[in-house]
């Protein structure tokens, strides 16, 4: 689901709709970090994280990034922390009671592509060597949920296929494990 949310966020942002695209991007980043926590608990400690345990992180990207970094050292600070804060702000502003008199939406698709590609690539690489083959399945082909029949129907309807959507204006395209 994280990959589908990421592709949906790209589509919305490329279509000039940051009001929906940025919260969807936030959800994609949240889901991939929570997925890491679930996979890490299962592989490293043979624990099943419950929905309740995951909910304690709420939708707070900064808290999630902090938790992920305590488990596997990554570079989620600096400019990316600012981007995570922008995504968090956009997620919080989904409802009118959170709107300010002047809303600013900073939609930087290049940053979204960079951080999402980085998370997908590096989370599994930070598992211990003996656990990496199992963790690598986590960062598999980004469009694997779409079989040939689904892609054909998407294209017949005149829509962008997932691979075309992933490739459109994406400087990080080569970092995704996709055909």
Which functions belong to the PLM regions below?
Residues 1-25, 35-44:
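Charged alpha-helical initiation segments
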